[in-house]
Amino acid sequence: MYTTYIATTPERLWQALTEPAFTERYWGVAFESDWTTGAPLVWKQGGARMSDPEQVVLVSDPYRQLAYTWHTFTEQWARAVDIAEEVRAELAVERRSTVTFDLEPQGRQVKLTVTQDFDPEGILHGMCSQGWPPILSSLKTLLETGEPLPAN
């Protein structure tokens, strides 16, 4: 679980979580979805396009909560983000995780809590525990300054 406080509105934070132009700036991922519960979710990252019937929006409560299933670990994705095939194959057999974003207004800021339910012993846990802190820091910086953190 990761929590950060962002000087923004719930509406602006929701926009940053759901609009491809935003997500691409701080995350390097663009999403295609109509963001209704049950809607498909397509990930675009590094030239790869990931789509799967199990890749869906689970909860869509605008300005309060967003949850969806994590992307499918395709060979195309692994090549696009430079993940070895052996690692991709191990990721592909882990149970599909979900990620939940809880937005809670607190005065002139929003408390954002991100929870991802994965196997704590799995490879994905290690990868995401290194990935979420810089993603959320860049999101916060983008919303507060207009520019994301520089990419590594």
Predicted feature residues:
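A short, structured loop/turn motif at beta-sheet edges
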Residues: 10, 58-65, 102-111
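Glycine-rich portal/gate segments that line the openings of hydrophobic small-molecule binding cavities
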Residues: 33-83
